[in-house]
């Protein structure tokens, strides 16, 4: 039984690529045809590629690997947060801060600062501080939470990246490649598939398409975790 069906992909509009004038020739092998100036993605290939990505993620998660979900475009923000939280993984759904991976120590300092402010609030220190100072701290906390909330529990570099639209997330992709972190990506007809280890050829602009594919990656993690729980129970 395949991980995803052709019907699901069609209903979510996964097959709609970009306009033919905005394409990357390297994506040619994933294109089925052209219709009304738009490339149509070969969904048989997508089914196969989703399966490959799913198996890789399941295997990784079964061995305790951590995945960072990355999608900062409007169409991806909600799905990335929801699905990463559902499978208890990390995410970046606002702006990617340069150095999130390659300058991890600095990012950790910012996370430490976020934790300090959270602790001050919990311990009631806000109640005794001047109002102006409290407003300033709350603003700082909001900003840090916005950009780092999805990775504040990420104590070390992730074992893989799941990226929606590698063209938009090119800084994240470049950092992962520099550190030899494998990348799974939803890759539309205007992207370069060579940058990605596990290419999922698909529409990266439709909310439903992004949600469907992101949920499959989360499912793979959850399947691995359920397998672990079952193994522990059997012992």
Curated annotation (Swiss-Prot):
PROSITE patterns: RIBOSOMAL_S2_1 (PS00962), RIBOSOMAL_S2_2 (PS00963)
A Gene Ontology term for the protein's cellular component: cytosolic small ribosomal subunit
GO biological process, one term: translation
Keyword Cell wall biogenesis/degradation: no
Source taxon at top rank: Bacteria
Matching InterPro entries: Ribosomal_uS2, Ribosomal_uS2_bac/mit/plastid, Ribosomal_uS2_CS, Ribosomal_uS2_flav_dom_sf
Keyword Ribosomal protein among record annotations: yes
Keywords in alphabetical order: Ribonucleoprotein, Ribosomal protein
PANTHER family listed in its UniProt record: 30S RIBOSOMAL PROTEIN S2 PROKARYOTIC AND ORGANELLAR (PTHR12534), SMALL RIBOSOMAL SUBUNIT PROTEIN US2M (PTHR12534:SF0)
Protein name: Small ribosomal subunit protein uS2
Organism for this UniProt entry: Geobacillus kaustophilus (strain HTA426)
């Amino acid at each position: 039984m395949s991980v995803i069906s052709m019907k699901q992909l069609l209903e979510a509009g996964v097959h709609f690529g970009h306009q033919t004038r905005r394409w990357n020739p390297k994506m040619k092998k994933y294109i089925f045809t052209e219709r009304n100036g738009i490339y149509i993605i070969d969904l048989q290939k997508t089914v196969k590629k989703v399966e490959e990505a799913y198996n890789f993620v399941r295997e990784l998660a079964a061995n305790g690997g951590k995945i960072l979900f990355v999608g900062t475009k409007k169409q991806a923000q909600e799905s990335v947060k929801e699905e990463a939280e559902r499978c208890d993984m990390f995410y970046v759904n606002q702006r990617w801060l340069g150095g999130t991976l390659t300058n991890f120590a600095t990012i950790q300092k910012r996370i430490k600062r976020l934790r300090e402010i959270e602790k001050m609030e919990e311990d009631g220190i806000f109640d005794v501080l001047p109002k102006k100072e409290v407003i300033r701290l709350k603003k700082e906390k909001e900003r840090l939470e916005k950009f780092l909330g999805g990775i504040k529990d990420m104590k070390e570099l992730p074992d893989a990246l799941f990226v929606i639209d590698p063209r938009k997330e090119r800084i994240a992709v470049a950092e992962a490649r520099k550190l030899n972190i494998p990348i799974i990506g939803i890759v539309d007809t205007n992207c370069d598939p060579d940058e990605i280890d596990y290419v999922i050829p698909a529409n990266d602009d439709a909310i439903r398409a992004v949600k469907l594919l992101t949920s499959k990656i989360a499912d793979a993690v959850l399947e691995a975790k359920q397998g672990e729980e079952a193994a522990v129970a059997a012992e």
